[in-house]
Curated annotation (Swiss-Prot):
It is found in: Plastid, Chloroplast thylakoid membrane. One of its GO terms (molecular function) is quinone binding. GO terms for biological process: ATP synthesis coupled electron transport; electron transport coupled proton transport. NDH is composed of at least 16 different subunits, 5 of which are encoded in the nucleus. Coiled coil: none annotated. It comes from Zea mays. The chain crosses the membrane at residues 9-29, 39-59, 89-109, 125-145, 147-167, 185-205, 219-239, 258-278, 280-300, 327-347, 354-374, 396-416, 425-445, 542-562, 610-630, 691-711, 717-737. The gene is ndhF. InterPro entries: NADH_UbQ_OxRdtase_chlpt_su5_C, NADHpl_OxRdtase_5_subgr, ND/Mrp_TM, NU5C-like, Proton_antipo_N. This is NAD(P)H-quinone oxidoreductase subunit 5, chloroplastic.
Length: 738
């Protein structure tokens, strides 16, 4: 066993040879390298597959042996200071290694087809392979300085990949926004690391945990200083895992290619913050104020992310806010000390969200020939609908991913989310209420995404109806109200120019010619007009979807309880995950062998599933089979004419829509307060520098010049002038002497 662990350091380095080969090829023989560019996908996938096999072998040994292995190289700077570099293999490391490698391989396979026509194909594979290397190095790090080094590499790779299409101004702005926002958290992380180094004189995890176990309980260290340093460490996780209030970069990160969106949201960047907290949880758990703050931030984030996802029309941004909300669940679980539930949800969510993002990429890929290659159109759910007829495999996989995230058994996320909900109710009813309510919202907005994308009729022609005199379907808001002529379309955040009904009953009447166009378009055979239809993607893109579907169906089994004997007349139950995590759980004395009451489990499961089903039902009422409502528009329009006054419910819907679609006005607030404020401060500083500082300096010089000129003309070389001024000076001197 130890012999295998000795070579674990190879895992992060395995993708490097192909990265260096592609880099040198692009610099030295660019033409030949680009001509053979599709060949480079194979070694990238092969080397990461070797890393996956190695990681799987380590994980099996972890489950069977339940041991922690650490190997260090000491680099002595002087007699008083030395740095230690190495790698750490424990249950948390093995879980993250499998997660990163499996999702990374599937994303690479998917990208080979998805990016095949892109000029930056090789550059994309270099970036994404280095992204995987950085994350593998992060999770195997044995101390804080190594974590910070790879932490910054992960941030750099995300910057490069989010701005991959840097010629698009929106993408360039998005990567800068992500970079700057994460710099705030990274600065806090660096200060926290330096603070703990000043306290302990070491950057090793074992020394930090010694503080938690010995010094803090015995008041051997300043608790206020320790709390401050722990808060700074947590700030790094807040930015990297898109927690409130540093979450604003996450939806803009969708400007990158869809495969990298899947990797960022499933196994790399946003998982890094959760990993950091899980790694340092033995330290945080000894600081009650920090734990309460972590759980509070997680609760705010999970609710905020769900509300902001309600009215998004971009399919990828909707999924991005979903990720934000689910990361909030993990943060809440860590804050209440539910280490196992947090990691369980990290695993199940990673595979489900990777499935959803790659499925959305398949949808986007099929829509681009119809609506163009602009993300504003190809990612717009307004122009989708009825795709279940054209992309049945993608539709099936997307539906399973949706139901999993909604918490429907026996899919993966049901088991992990149910455990978090149960633990949150036990910890605090306040957290339990918000987490449970958000579970219903999750089911609502996720099923909304599915219905707008795959249900009803294909609405691709809505983009051309703005000139139709009888009615405009493209100008219908997502909440069912037509955009009036008086709407200010230049509002700083409101880009609402199109949409699909949120409440289907209020859809305006469709003209006859419009209905005919829709009918002929959505009928593949016998259509009068010739159209290009959406089509299923190739096998290279479908294969990762099917593999992720299997993970979504069965990965939840690692958290299912099985009989582990009887103790004190109670049945002890154990899960594969709890056995896997036993060494890590023992670090902070959490009992891995918990007694489970089947009745309590069923009660909690029924309540959580009921909330999910209720959310699905409400979403289906508002969005399901939109074409069936089109047939009753005359009746609905008659009701609207009879009741022209807006009800209180309409006002509430309008407010909720405005809040959700405009991102809670948080970006607007940051723009007004921070961006414009900093610009005004810069202008004021520039004025003070030029007008006051330079003015004083230039004024002194100018005054000296003028005085010199006056003295020059005073002398003139005449003795009479010298005598005159001499007498004047003597007279003044005598006059002022008392």
């Amino acid at each position: 066993m130890e012999h295998t662990y000795q070579y674990a350091w190879v895992i992060p380095l395995l993708p490097l040879p192909v990265i260096m080969s592609m880099g040198f090829g692009l610099f030295l023989i660019p033409t030949a390298t680009k001509n053979l560019r599709r060949i480079w996908a194979f070694p990238s996938i092969l080397l990461l597959s070797i890393a996956m096999v190695f990681s799987l072998h380590l994980s099996i040994q972890q489950i069977n042996g339940s041991s922690i292995y650490q190997y260090l190289w000491s680099w002595t700077i002087n007699n008083d200071f030395s740095l230690e570099f190495g790698y750490l293999v424990d249950p948390l490391t093995s879980i993250m290694l499998i997660l990163i490698t499996t999702v990374g391989i599937l994303v690479l396979i998917y990208s080979d087809d998805y990016m095949s026509h892109d000029e930056g194909y090789l550059r994309f594979f270099v970036y994404i392979s280095f992204f995987n290397t950085s994350m593998l190095g992060l999770v195997t790090s044995s101390n804080l300085i190594q974590i910070y080094f790879f932490w910054e590499l992960v941030g750099m790779c995300s910057y490069l990949l989010i701005g991959f299409w840097f010629t698009r101004p929106i993408a360039a702005s998005a990567c800068q926004k992500a970079f700057v926002t994460n710099r705030v958290g990274d600065f806090g992380l660096l200060l926290g690391i330096l603070g703990f180094f000043w306290i302990t004189g070491s950057l090793e995890f074992r020394d930090l945990f010694k503080i938690a176990n010995n010094w803090i309980p015995n008041n051997g260290i300043n608790s206020l200083l320790t709390t401050l340093c722990a808060f700074l460490l947590f700030l790094g996780a807040v930015a990297k895992s898109a927690q409130f209030p540093l979450h604003v970069w996450l939806p803009d990160a969708m400007e990158g290619p869809t495969p990298i969106s899947a990797l960022i949201h499933a196994a790399t960047m946003v998982a890094a913050g959760i990993f950091l907290l899980a790694r340092l949880l033995p330290l945080f758990i000894s600081l009650p104020w920090i734990m309460s703050f972590i759980s509070l931030i997680g609760t705010i984030t999970l609710f905020l992310g769900a509300t902001l996802a309600l009215a998004q029309r971009d399919i990828k941004r909707s999924l991005a806010y979903s990720t934000m909300s689910q990361l909030g669940y993990m943060m809440l679980a860590l804050g209440i000390g539910s280490y196992q539930a947090a990691l369980f949800h990290l695993i199940t969510h990673a595979y489900s969200k990777a499935l959803l993002f790659l499925g959305s990429g398949s949808v986007i890929h099929s829509m681009e020939p119809l609506v163009g290659y602009s993300p504003d159109k190809s990612q717009n759910m307004v122009l989708m609908g009825g795709l279940r007829k054209y992309v049945p495999i993608t539709r099936t996989t997307f539906l399973c991913g949706t139901l999993s995230l909604c918490g429907i058994p026996p899919l993966a996320c049901f088991w992990s989310k149910d455990e978090i909900l149960s633990n949150s109710w036990l910890y605090s009813p306040f957290f339990g209420i918000i987490a449970s309510f958000t579970a219903g919202l999750t089911a609502f907005y996720m099923f909304r995404i599915y219905l707008l994308t795959f249900d009803g009729y294909l609405r691709v022609h809505f983009q051309n109806y703005s000139s139709t005199k009888e009615g405009s379907l493209y100008s219908i808001s997502l909440w069912g109200k037509s955009i009036s002529k008086g709407v200010n379309r230049d509002f700083v955040l409101s880009t609402m120019k199109s949409g699909v009904s949120f409440f289907s009953q209020n859809i305006p009447k469709i003209p006859a010619n419009t209905r005919n166009k829709i009918g002929s378009f959505s009928t593949p055979f016998g259509a009068k007009n010739t159209f290009v239809y959406p089509h299923e993607t190739g096998n290279t893109m479908l294969f990762p979807l099917l593999i992720l579907l299997l993970f979504t169906l069965f990965i939840g089994s690692i958290g299912i309880h099985f009989d582990n004997g009887v103790k004190d007349n109670r049945i002890l139950e154990l899960t594969i995950l709890s056995k896997w995590l036993t060494p890590s759980i023992n670090l902070f004395q959490e009992n891995s062998n918990s007694s489970i009451n089947s009745y309590e489990f069923l009660t909690n499961a029924i309540s959580s599933v009921s909330l999910a089903i209720f959310g699905l039902f409400i979403a289906y009422i508002f969005y399901g089979s939109a074409y069936s409502f089109f047939q009753n528009l005359n009746f609905q329009n008659s009701l609207v004419k009879k009741n022209p006054k807006k009800s209180f419910l309409d006002e509430v819907k309008k407010k909720i829509y405005s809040w959700s679609y405009n991102r809670g006005y948080i970006d607007f607030f940051y723009t007004r307060v921070f961006i414009l404020g900093i610009r005004k401060l810069a202008e004021l500083t520039h004025f003070f520098d030029k007008g006051v500082i330079d003015g004083i300096t230039n004024g002194v010089g100018l005054a000296g010049f003028c005085i010199g000129e006056e003295i020059k003309y005073v002398g003139g070389g005449r003795i009479s002038s010298y005598l005159f001024f001499f007498l004047c000076y003597v007279s003044l001197f005598l006059f002022f002497i008392p």
